[in-house]
Amino acid sequence: MKTMEAIIRRLPVKGVDGSLELIELDAIFYLEAGEGDTLIRTKRKKPYRSVQRLHELAKRLPAPAFVQCHREYIVNLNRVRALTPRGSRDWDLRLDPPVNRRIPIARDRLVDIYKILGL
């Protein structure tokens, strides 16, 4: 018998309008903490908005595919195209198209991300 974790491949998200969205985990590029809400970016142009805080959603995301690389961001490592330097000591995660966003990596998280990626 399959476990519930193996069966459920969607993230339930409470929308700001009171709706409940079920977002496929593979479709998520990143989550970003906002002021009083969280943005969830997928391929669609308009991000999902959730009333749930980033740390609440983080508990429901499978590790190590989803990693909190910065206090304001959780990234799906399956959607990362490259790690790029930003200055002498800082790094960004560059995401796949169509998002093509650069997400900062906190210095204290860089070693953990290297380990997850096997670097």
Model feature map: region roles:
Residues 2-119:
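Basic, polyanion-interacting recognition surfaces, primarily
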